Amino acid sequence: LTFEDGRKLTCTEDHPVLTSDNTWVKVKDLELNATKIKTSITCPLVDVNEEIKECSDWKLQVGNILLQTNTHEEYMKTLAFARIIGLLITDGHMNVKDKIASLFLGHMIDVYSILEDIKMFCESQQTNFVIKNLFIVRIPAKLTNQIIQLPGLLSGRKVNQTGMLPEFILDEKCPRPIIREFLGGMFGGDGHTCVLGMHRGKRDLLSSVSFSQTKTYEHRESLQSMFEDIQKLLAKCGIHSTTIQKPKETSFSKNKYQLQDKNDASNRSFQLTLHLPMEQLIPFSEKIGFRYCCHKSQRLEAGVSYRRLREEVCRQHNWLVNRVDEITHFKEIKSKNPDKTVPTKSAIIKAVEELKKTEGLLHDYAIPSTHDITDHLIKGTEFGKFTSKSFPTAEQFMEKIGALNWFLSDDNQPKKIDHMNEEVLEKTEEKEENELSAGYGVHRGSNALPTMNLEVVSRINVGPKHVYDISVEETHSFLANGIVAHNCMVSHGAARFTRERLYDVSDKFQVHVCSKCGMVAAYNDALGIHCCKMCDNRTDFAYVEIPYSCKLLFQELQTMNVVPRIMTE
């Protein structure tokens, strides 16, 4: 299946998909260019084992915590730590003297995500997270006491201190996956997602991703240096051509010091912004993304959808032009005889039919005219300005797929509070200036993510394929069994969600497995006694986490002389 934004889905013909009217329809019964399918955030798929190899035994000592990347569990724990630190230095507050650290979030979904990561290190006893327009997660003291020992973190108010990044992330040996998670946390905090801007009375300007921070006048140079370091980190993750905007005084600072001498900038705050070009929007979504901010992720998905449509239409247009040239030898004939007329109408029709048989035509705007063919093949002009009224603007596209409210809705619900410390107040005011005035992508009272509705423009038989989505190497998402299911990058939360549903809430259980024969061993952790009754092994065991039902199933099978074994590396 090819959807109207260019994304593709490979499935069996009797695979059920959820339509925009909340009914399940088999793929073979879909009405092309009419039926709309529900879809949501589609995250890239990564090979965890390959990334562990890429990290090549990297490790970091943080207080009493040793972060490593040798095993899957250690690797996931290290990624979680990088995400937490990325958010802490942007939308967080740390006080070394009081030994406290807090994280500021915009939605309860994000709170659950951060708690899952914190749980890898220690349990959190916090139950109330709401304060004014924010959700606050207080990092447990056990973890905070280790974090404050990390070099390069600022304690107290960050706005009037030198801008810097943690030392471990600036180390040339720091692996790309860890940098990716750190940047994801940073952009989840002080990053800015796609925005629909006004242009000539219409909301048709779609902005790209950016990142900003504020410092007082005397610390502007350090902030500039910090942003240059961020540019280098982005480049390591494959994001290039970023630009840093000149410092600009914040409106909050202007209002606060409006009666002060304008020549005295000592106490004024200036914001520095790093911009990603629109060409890097899709690469940013695929290679980094936002962590701990469902609102930004949701808008990014819609922005990527529109950007993908434009890029795919350009690609199809150029393919059609080149195919017409192959059929008619247009360029060759014109180079020999510029005045000769070369018929192209039938060739264009033939090329379009060929395209429809292979992948489907996304939009009629991709079909070239004879004038387009002349411009591209003879004059060398490029396609992609999208000035025609027949091609949808960003606002029209968002409205069509049901994502416009993600950019327009005003979902501010101030909460009544009795007291707030200075740091929380400062963060709240900063939030109100930068974020809360805009529409929120996910309704704050919702416990689920919204979906987009995309038309199916093409359905093509691709022959035998693996029926299990997990065996497909390409990026896919699909709808099944009444829920939205995805192949997601572990860092975007899918792996943690799967672990929660299949292990944490399913009577989680731990066993010690004999590394020699794979049988579950008898053990006493308190006394450190382990014994395999099958091979009398007493020294070589592996710790394995499985659902209790799985352990019970193994024991039932053993009573029937069927012996399941858990072989570990």
Locations of the language-model features?
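Internal intein/HINT superfamily modules and their associated LAGLIDADG
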Residues: 1-487
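C-terminal interaction appendages of subunits in large macromolecular complexes
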Residues: 237-240, 248, 488-569
